[in-house]
Amino acid sequence: HRRSSAASDVYKRQEIQNWIERVAHLPADGLEDPPDACIIELGGTVGDIESSPYIEALRQFQFRVGRDNVTFVHVSLVPVMGPVGEQKTKPTQHSVKELRGLGITPDILVCRSTQPMTDETKEKLAAFCHVSPDAVMSTHDVPNIYHVPLMLEKQGLCKILGIDCNDTSVLEEWREMAYDLDKLTEDVSIAMVGKYTDLSDSYLSVIKSLQHAAMKVRRKLSINWIEASHLEDHWKTNNSDEYESAWQGLKESDGVLVPGGFGDRGVEGKINAARYARENNIPYLGICLGLQVATIEFCRNVLGMDGANSTEFDENAEYPAVIFMPEISKTHLGGTMRLGSRPTFWQVEDCKIKRLYGTDDSVDERHRHRYEVNPDIIENIEQAGMKFVGKDETGQRCEIFELDDHVYYVGVQYHPEFKSRPGRPSPPFLGLLMASSGLKL
């Protein structure tokens, strides 16, 4: 048994290295060329048992590809203590010692602090951590996170890595974006209606996508976090203050976003949010479950299907508007979802969301779902004004809807947040922010 466990550990470390080498050559900017570099983040704290297989895999990896092809960057906190604001180096010294004991020697130290590090602090860290003083980087507090790459470049990071920053205009474009972000004055607010609102990291990719789109339309973004269950009618009896607060937050927002999720908690609240946005011409974006609840709402309140629901929440729904996909196994739910990047083909010549994506006949986006809009009711839905403008390669599965005669009411079955980047926001998010800012689509 012990021998089997050891063999399993070896296999894991090999697979980690294989994965890194494979993804390091995948295009990351939407083009066909391989990337110049691959950044691998190993989170947590040095010495944690959870990260030990990855640290050992990286230790081996440096010899597998050659030490000249790997740079280890250690990110550490330099706390400021006492009334005089002394910068303490002991935490970083200790973590570097631990890391070197595990076989990894950092080439660069990136040190977080509230204020720029003094030369004395840098020299002390260099002496005790076995790195060049030029390789000790200060990353202090800045107005927005997009200043951080500029801060590192100014301290000579590109020179250490052997990168010619004059060979591209990307850094200058990034600099312009970072400083423009400091000057934004016009606000735009988006209501995020979800079930995990106490932990915003649950929606980190969605938040970043909203920020990317807000930068593009030159607006300061504020997110109104709304617990979906607080919008439900029964919550008025349970806690009237939370009910009123949730509805006030929704009504004060310029746009509404319902992200993906699983389970029935808060679903009726999401349906109420979709109805409010539809009836009041408020920009709306539904992602995955957000598309499904908007479809259910439309069936109930436009088509008169009072019992419409998803079979995920009611297996005996009178009108099953959203159903379990026939090819998915109900026995092994975790391994049989419709996953990964898949094409969606346009079904119309022109619509708002298609114009945002561009002129291609299809779009590739990442999926993660088990349920779909019931194909049997699509014709009824479209006749009432909700058009399924994007479908899968079979032409049967609905991927994108857009509502006629609405400023912006869009649902997507996939997860566009995973492809959004600074300077290249995801089209569905860009459309939401443009409409919420009063800009013409």
Regions found by a protein language model. Name each.
Residues 24, 53, 62-63, 69-166, ...:
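Internal gly/pro-rich beta-alpha loop/helix module
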Residues 249-345, 350-352, 414-416, 422, ...:
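Cysteine-nucleophile active-site neighborhood
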Residues 4, 32, 247-252:
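A short, aliphatic-rich alpha-helical micro-motif
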Residues 145-207, 211-218, 222-238, 247, ...:
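Acyltransferase
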Residues 46-54, 84-85, 201-204, 261-272, ...:
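Glycine/threonine-rich flexible loop motifs
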